[in-house]
Amino acid sequence: MRQLLANARRHEAQMVRLLGRFVRAESPSTDKAAVDRFGRLVAAEWRGHGARVRILRQRAYGDHVRAELFLGRGRPRGQILVLGHLDTVYDVGTLARTPFRIARGRAWGPGTFDMKSGLVIALFAVDALRRAGLRPSRRLVFLWTS
C-alpha cells in the first residue's frame, strides 16, 4: 500500500493537470453535445493508456464510455466493474465564474469533486497497478455514464 501511495504522490502533478483538462471540459447533464465532447476526451485518455474503448451512443442524453483492460495473464476470471458519470450539474458558462484552480492544497471548479476527480483517479489507479507489477486476474471494466 505504501508503494502505491508513494507512486500516486510522484504523479500528483500529472493528475492535477488532467483534472484541470477534465474540469475545463464543461459537461452539463442537459447538454448532450457537451457531454459527448467530454466523453470523447475521456475515451482518448483511456485509449492512450491501453484500454479497449467503446462509445455507447445515447439518443437524448450524453453517450456512455466503456473502457476495458486486462492486466493479468491467461484468461480473465470474471471482471470488476467500476461505475461513474461524465455529466455535471453545472451549466455551460459556470467555468467563467468559477474557474478550475488549486488553492490551499485543494482543487476547485465545477465537477471537480463529483465526479471528474474520480475519473482521473480511476485512470491513474490502473497505471499504479501496472507500475507496481500487480496483475489482477479479473478484467477491469470502467463504465462512465451520463
Language-model regions: role of each:
Residues 115-146:
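Acidic/histidine-rich catalytic neighborhood of metal-dependent amide-processing enzymes
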Residues 1-110, 128-137:
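Acidic/His- and Gly-rich active-site-bordering loop/insert found
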